[in-house]
Amino acid sequence: MATTSRRFTTGLFASITSVKSHSANRPQSISLIRRNHIDHRLPLIVPSSRRWIIQAARSWDGFDDGAEAEIKKPGAYGYAIGDNEIEGSSSSTVHVIDGEHVKTAEIVIWAAVTAAFGVGNRVMYKLALVPLKEYPFFLAQLSTFGYVAVYYTILYFRYRAGTVTDAMLSVPKSPFLIVGILEALAAAAGMAAAANLSGPSTTVLSQTFLVWQIFFSIIFLGRRYSVNQILGCTLVALGVIVSVASGSGAAHSLNEAGVLWILLMVLSFLLQGAGTVLKEVIFIDSQRRLKGASLDLFIVNSYGSAFQAICIALLLPFLSKLWGIPFNQLGTYLKDGAVCFLNNGTITKGCDGAPFLPLLFVIMNIGYNIALLRLLKISSAVVSCLASTVSVPIAVFLFTMPLPYLGVASSLPKGFMGGTIILVLGMILYSWTPHGANSSHTDSVIPSPPPT
């Protein structure tokens, strides 16, 4: 009667060996032992002829402790699922739980960082438009084309430092092309619709972004969301609508706006949602291609931004027309915008605050995009969207304060406090895990028996 064993070591390398006569010191690796006979030395006899035992063990160091090495040490645990008996060390469970807690803490930290950058991004964009109020299209193109140079510069230094590897750079580029096309089309559709919709109406319609992300996560990632998560997302979106658009005539504005512009704005957020979920798919797929290694987020930022810039360049005749700039005058417009941005030259009247305020916006926007993509990488597209959504009412509140260059502060919307409470309740409900919801989680982490 031969006994075969497959050993998966949890150290820096994995080894698969056949063990016939020795019993190793096992407390830190996983040994999957297939028994084709009934071992009378075991205190428990099961009539099944095929059993898999999963046992926490230390890598074998060549010393044999004898037959007694099979006896469970204090602190070990065992249980069975069907015909499968599972044995392991309680310390292994502690490490898994600690790892989950560390990841949860990291997600919370990056969610807070993303929300903070989101607030700063919204505030600094409004401040940047003070000196560039005549050149908003220039600022938009600076954000599109200037960031490509910034991201590739960062990527170059990370490659030189060894953080980015050749294997990472060799991943397929077609997904990045699709991301660039989606984001460029989303920008074009959003600009066209925003020109015919009021600000509060756009805020209401922007909440469909979260809906599309949930939809695409279910379709392309196979995710399943619990009732409390769906309800939590709904409350977050409702809270933003109530806190920002209440009392502003948003409903009346939507009734007056044409159906075409409403559908075009919804299409814009659909394309953005698809692009965001596709980035998550890229991160997940890269782990398989890189054999468990994590794809550097600056690769996604760099290639995605480059393809988006190419698509935007092709759409410039259409986009300039949306901004009321004849295409034959676009070159002069961009040149004058650059002079105002630098605040150096003949066109400096009304450019007070440049280049300081626009540069602050550029820095804040880059930080926001990096934090948003980092949060998406370690969590999901939906979580990153929720963190970004929280920044909306906070920014609205900050605009009620006497900020420099903005003049008279705005007043809070009538339903701001009520909407904020709804939003917070939605966030709590989304993150709440009902008791016993993870009871089946253990089954999903038990490795399947190797083929026979």
UniProtKB/Swiss-Prot annotation:
Transit peptide segment: 1-34
Transmembrane stretches, start-end: 105-125, 137-157, 175-195, 202-222, 230-250, 258-278, 307-327, 353-373, 389-409, 412-432
Main location: plastid
Segments forming a coiled coil: none
Knockout or disruption consequences: No visible phenotype. Clt1, clt3 and clt3 triple mutants are more sensitive to Cd(2+), have a decreased level of cytosolic GSH, an altered systemic acquired resistance response and are more sensitive to Phytophthora infection. Clt1, clt3 and clt3 triple mutants have decreased lateral root densities.
Pfam families: CRT-like (PF08627)
SUPFAM superfamilies cross-referenced by the UniProt entry: Multidrug resistance efflux transporter EmrE
Record's bilayer topology term: Multi-pass membrane protein
Protein name: Protein CLT3, chloroplastic
